[in-house]
UniProtKB/Swiss-Prot annotation:
Keywords assigned by UniProt, alphabetized: Ribonucleoprotein, Ribosomal protein
UniProt-listed HAMAP family: Ribosomal_bL28
Family named by the database record: Belongs to the bacterial ribosomal protein bL28 family.
UniProt protein name: Large ribosomal subunit protein bL28
InterPro entries associated with the record: Ribosomal_bL28, Ribosomal_bL28/bL31-like_sf, Ribosomal_bL28_bact-type, Ribosomal_bL28_sf
Coiled coil: none
UniProt GO MF annotations: structural constituent of ribosome
Gene name of the encoded protein: rpmB
Length: 77
């Protein structure tokens, strides 16, 4: 299963671990993804999404109905 946010599309980034001696080794920065259930009043049901913490703030700001409408317009839900 891909580590991708359902709402924002955030994915893992690639960077470096840097030691005290300035040696660099590749690493992945993973997004902070959580499975959350959202109650959709208009559909009278729960919707389960894998969202980042940034997406949670976006849902708090715009509302779950608006976010789901955007997802459906993109063909992702």
């Amino acid at each position: 299963m891909a580590r991708v946010c359902d709402v924002t599309g955030k994915k893992p980034m690639v960077g470096n671990n840097v030691s005290h001696a300035n040696n660099k080794t590749k690493r992945r920065f993973l997004p902070n993804l959580q499975y959350r259930r959202f109650w959709v009043e208009s559909e009278n049901r729960w919707v389960r999404l894998r969202v980042s913490s940034a997406a949670l703030r976006l849902i708090d700001k715009n509302g779950i109905d608006s976010v789901l409408a955007d997802l459906r317009a993109r063909g992702q839900a």
